[in-house]
């Protein structure tokens, strides 16, 4: 019986089974190598990704995160500065818009004040010129406005004294020109005698 089993020919089915069993054993090493390569490549890719990712993460970590309080403060500061700049720009535009009107108003007020001052000075000078024509003056007189007013007051006082005296003749009263000339001469003499200097000192 042993000889029969050993000498019995192997059927094709047995060969195919044995071959099929050997083929997976032969194919396993390449698959293992491929798996190893895939694992190595995946590790390399993971390591490379981790490297740039780490760098990127470090860059992000070095800066402020979007939700960090430092960046929030900076954001608020930048927003505040931007708002202030906008407000400053708005104020400049409003002031620039209102400045020409205020400048024109100031100019018109100054012009009107200058016109009023010129009119007042002109009328005052005309009044003093008329007063100097009435008051008897000496050729050497260079009277200021205050001196002219004082001389006019003294001349009025002199005229009052002349009217109170009996020296005024009726003929002199009838001729106004002669009366004015004599009064002017008398007033000039009165001034030169020192009455004016004494009154001016007071």
Swiss-Prot record:
Biased composition (Low complexity): 1-18
Compositional bias of kind Gly residues: 46-65, 80-99
One GO term (biological process): negative regulation of double-strand break repair
Entry-linked Pfam families: HLH
Cellular compartments annotated: Nucleus
Tissues in which the UniProt entry reports expression: Subset of mesodermal cells.
Disulfide pattern: none
Alphabetical UniProt keywords: Activator, Biological rhythms, Craniosynostosis, Developmental protein, Differentiation, Disease variant, DNA-binding, Myogenesis, Nucleus, Repressor, Transcription, Transcription regulation
Residue ranges of domain bHLH in the record: 108-159
Gene3D superfamilies in alphabetical order: Helix-loop-helix DNA-binding domain (4.10.280.10)
Compositional bias segments (type: Basic residues): 34-43
InterPro entries: bHLH_dom (IPR011598), E-box_TF_Regulators (IPR050283), HLH_DNA-bd_sf (IPR036638), TWIST1_bHLH (IPR047093)
Cellular component terms per the entry's GO annotation: chromatin; nucleoplasm; nucleus
Coiled-coil residue spans: none
Entry superkingdom: Eukaryota
A single MF term (Gene Ontology): bHLH transcription factor binding
Region: Sufficient for transactivation activity, residue numbers: 161-191
Region (Disordered): 1-105
Disorder noted: Saethre-Chotzen syndrome: A craniosynostosis syndrome characterized by coronal synostosis, brachycephaly, low frontal hairline, facial asymmetry, hypertelorism, broad halluces, and clinodactyly. Robinow-Sorauf syndrome: An autosomal dominant syndrome characterized by craniosynostosis, asymmetry of orbits, flat face, hypertelorism, a thin, long, and pointed nose, shallow orbits, strabismus, and broad great toes with a duplication of the distal phalanx. RSS is clinically similar to Saethre-Chotzen syndrome, with the most characteristic additional feature in Robinow-Sorauf syndrome being a bifid or partially duplicated hallux.
Protein purpose: Acts as a transcriptional regulator. Inhibits myogenesis by sequestrating E proteins, inhibiting trans-activation by MEF2, and inhibiting DNA-binding by MYOD1 through physical interaction. This interaction probably involves the basic domains of both proteins. Also represses expression of pro-inflammatory cytokines such as TNFA and IL1B. Regulates cranial suture patterning and fusion. Activates transcription as a heterodimer with E proteins. Regulates gene expression differentially, depending on dimer composition.
Subunit description: Efficient DNA binding requires dimerization with another bHLH protein. Homodimer or heterodimer with E proteins such as TCF3. ID1 binds preferentially to TCF3 but does not interact efficiently with TWIST1 so ID1 levels control the amount of TCF3 available to dimerize with TWIST1 and thus determine the type of dimer formed.
Protein name, as recorded: Twist-related protein 1
Protein source organism: Homo sapiens (Human)
UniProt lineage: Eukaryota, Metazoa, Chordata, Craniata, Vertebrata
Name of the gene encoding the protein in the UniProt record: TWIST1
């Amino acid at each position: 019986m042993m000889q029969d089993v050993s000498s019995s020919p192997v059927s094709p089915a047995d060969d195919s089974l044995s071959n099929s069993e050997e083929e997976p054993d032969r194919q396993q090493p390449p698959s293992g190598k491929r798996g190893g390569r895939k694992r190595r490549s995946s590790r390399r890719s993971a390591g490379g990704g981790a490297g740039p990712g780490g760098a990127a993460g470090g860059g992000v970590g070095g800066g402020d995160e979007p939700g960090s309080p430092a960046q929030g403060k900076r954001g608020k500061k930048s927003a505040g500065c931007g708002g202030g700049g906008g407000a400053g720009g708005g104020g400049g535009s409003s002031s620039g818009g209102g400045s020409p009107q205020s400048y024109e108003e100031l100019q018109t007020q100054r012009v009107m004040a200058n016109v009023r001052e010129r009119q007042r000075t002109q009328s005052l000078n005309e009044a003093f010129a008329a007063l100097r024509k009435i008051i008897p003056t000496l050729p050497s007189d260079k009277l200021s406005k205050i001196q002219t007013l004082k001389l006019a007051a003294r001349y009025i006082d002199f005229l009052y004294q002349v009217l109170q005296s009996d020296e005024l003749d009726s003929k002199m009263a009838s001729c106004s020109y002669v009366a004015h000339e004599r009064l002017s001469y008398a007033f000039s003499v009165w001034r030169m005698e020192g009455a004016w200097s004494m009154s001016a000192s007071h």
